[in-house]
Amino acid sequence: NPDQKQKLIENPELMPNFLQECIRMVSPVIHMRRTTTCETELGGQLMGPGEKIVMWYGAANRDPSVFTNPDKFDIERENADKHLAFGIGRHTCVGKPVALMQLEESYKQILSRFPNIHMSGNWKVAPNNFVHAIQEMPVKF
C-alpha cells in the first residue's frame, strides 16, 4: 500500500492508528480457544459446560458489521483500535503496551532510514497454526 505508506511519512501523527490497522489486518495470534464453565448462549447457539469455543481473530477483525470495507487497509480508519487482536477485558494480553511500543519504534526507524523501502516480491508466511510469522519478505530500498 504505497499510498498509505506515503500518507504515514507525511503525517507521522497517524502512527498510532497505523499500528492498530496493521494489527487489525494481520493479527499476531490466529485463534484462541476457551472452554465454557456453565451453560451459555453465543450467537443463538446453546452450549453446555465444558464445550470448546474457538475465536478466529482474522474473522472478528474483519467483521463487516464492525469495520466498513473490512478488507481495505486504511490508516485513517476511525475504529481501527476496535480489533480483538490482543483479546478483551480480563483476557487482554499483558504484553499489549510493550508490543505497541516495539512496533512503533520499529516502524519509525525503518521509515526514517529507508523511506523508499518497498516489497520486491511475494512474502512467505511461516507454517504455523497459532501465530502469524513472516518467514520471508523480499524488499528493496
Question: Which positions does each model-derived feature cover?
Answer:
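Cytochrome P450
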Residues: 1-141
